[in-house]
Amino acid sequence: MFDAAPIKKVSVVIPVYNEQESLPELIRRTTAACESLGKAWEILLIDDGSSDSSAELMVKASQEADSHIISILLNRNYGQHAAIMAGFSHVSGDLIITLDADLQNPPEEIPRLVAKADEGFDVVGTVRQNRQDSLFRKSASKIINLLIQRTTGKAMGDYGCMLRAYRRPIIDTMLRCHERSTFIPILANIFARRATEIPVHHAEREFGDSKYSFMRLINLMYDLVTCLTTTPLRLLSLLGSVIAIGGFSLSVLLIVLRLALGPQWAAEGVFMLFAVLFTFIGAQFIGMGLLGEYIGRIYNDVRARPRYFVQQVIYPESTPFTEESHQ
């Protein structure tokens, strides 16, 4: 077994999108958790194009005396995982922890993740206990987790929880990947030699509403299906073969019945023919739509456009500066 490098510095990466109500409490509690580690630490807040005063609060926190907070401002909303990747590109720690800004996963769990990673794990995931989400969110999460487990073969219990710890080599490897649709927990587990999970507390959301609407969850499902595997395309080929064989068999059967029962029966079977035809057409459209998803993602990857555009980075006790597009 390989000995893992000691953890000397911890970086906490937090994507922020319209979280002005929770930010002061988030910063206070995360700072307190990091101070208890007995290691060097930093907090990176990434504003993902917020329309409220989240960015102003972040900048103010970075400019306070003895601040350990780095604020990264994106020029618009790129999504949670793109914002986290923007944070990854600015970390300096040996262990990187991701955390949502809504305080549903308590920052007080950070020392437990660090302690577990100190045992030599490359990735430390978490499983939310007594989830305080709606039935719809819980059901969608179960479906997504089952889909990921079946596709990747890695039996992690809760891929949807972003409270996770990654060692620096895993982060550096993910930054070298250039997929447009990135689901960080899965990508990290692909490269991790040793991964584990620990149970964590899950609190009810105190401020605002979830940023994952029904349509965003549907889009996430499409992202997972098309970025993880080509199995759906193989299933389409199998389905096409079954339909072709079924259609040929049905044609033979109809010809035999036509000859046996006469032309009167043929007229009575028109509606059945239409039903079969519409079934085949529906299957074709489903296949075309799924194939289009794959082609669209290939097109986006070939264009190689940046995943995000960093507008400003504010370091503690430093002057804000403007950057070019990154990653």
UniProtKB/Swiss-Prot annotation:
Disulphide linkage map: none
Residue stretches spanning the membrane: 236-256, 270-290
Catalytic activity entry: UDP-4-deoxy-4-formamido-beta-L-arabinose + di-trans,octa-cis-undecaprenyl phosphate = 4-deoxy-4-formamido-alpha-L-arabinopyranosyl di-trans,octa-cis-undecaprenyl phosphate + UDP
Alphabetic keyword roster: Antibiotic resistance, Cell inner membrane, Cell membrane, Glycosyltransferase, Lipid A biosynthesis, Lipid biosynthesis, Lipid metabolism, Lipopolysaccharide biosynthesis, Membrane, Transferase, Transmembrane, Transmembrane helix
Ranges per topology, Periplasmic: 257-269
PANTHER family noted in UniProt: UNDECAPRENYL-PHOSPHATE 4-DEOXY-4-FORMAMIDO-L-ARABINOSE TRANSFERASE, UNDECAPRENYL-PHOSPHATE 4-DEOXY-4-FORMAMIDO-L-ARABINOSE TRANSFERASE-RELATED
Family classification: Belongs to the glycosyltransferase 2 family.
Record's function text: Catalyzes the transfer of 4-deoxy-4-formamido-L-arabinose from UDP to undecaprenyl phosphate. The modified arabinose is attached to lipid A and is required for resistance to polymyxin and cationic antimicrobial peptides.
Identification of the protein by name: Undecaprenyl-phosphate 4-deoxy-4-formamido-L-arabinose transferase
Organism from which the protein derives: Salmonella dublin (strain CT_02021853)
Lineage per the UniProt record: Bacteria, Pseudomonadati, Pseudomonadota, Gammaproteobacteria, Enterobacterales
